[in-house]
């Protein structure tokens, strides 16, 4: 059971359900999820890098290498139980938000609760890289960040 302490953090509830559902019904070999999950990732990495969280070093390193070749900037952040502890509750299994420090990591740790230990998983927080603002060289709108890297990863490792 999840204690909802912040109704504005609803996306992680849905994403957690989807992660569990996908494992249960589709039996994937690995999982990628991409979400504009936290504004805090913009504070951490700006609008140049996507935040990458993974429970599997090999899978993550393969993907980061593909990102580099694809010119899609990505930076790995830790999945650390110290941050996950911020989700503990005395009245439920966990809460949907933790403290203000490391909140992108805390959000990823929330999602980690819905991923089976043996399932290789990458969470990409793309809040900073998902949208362009209009400049001389770009139009206002979605960037499609991750499409090239995901395609190249699947082509190389599937």
Role assignments for model-derived ranges:
Residues 1-158:
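A generic structural signal for tightly packed, nonpolar segments enriched in small/aliphatic residues
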């Amino acid at each position: 059971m999840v204690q909802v302490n912040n109704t504005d953090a609803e996306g992680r509830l849905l994403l957690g359900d989807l992660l569990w559902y996908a494992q249960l019904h589709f039996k994937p070999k690995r999982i990628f999820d991409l979400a504009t999950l936290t504004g805090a990732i913009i504070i951490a990495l700006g609008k140049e890098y996507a935040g990458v969280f993974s429970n599997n070093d090999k899978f993550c390193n393969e993907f980061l290498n593909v990102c580099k070749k694809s010119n899609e900037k990505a930076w790995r952040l830790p999945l650390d139980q110290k941050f996950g502890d911020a989700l503990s509750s005395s009245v439920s299994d966990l809460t949907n938000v933790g403290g203000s420090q490391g909140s992108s990591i805390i959000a990823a740790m929330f999602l980690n609760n819905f991923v089976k230990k043996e399932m290789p998983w990458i969470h990409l927080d793309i809040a900073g890289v998902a949208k362009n603002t209009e400049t001389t060289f770009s139009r206002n709108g979605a960037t499609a960040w991750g499409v090239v890297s995901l395609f190249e990863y699947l082509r190389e490792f599937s």
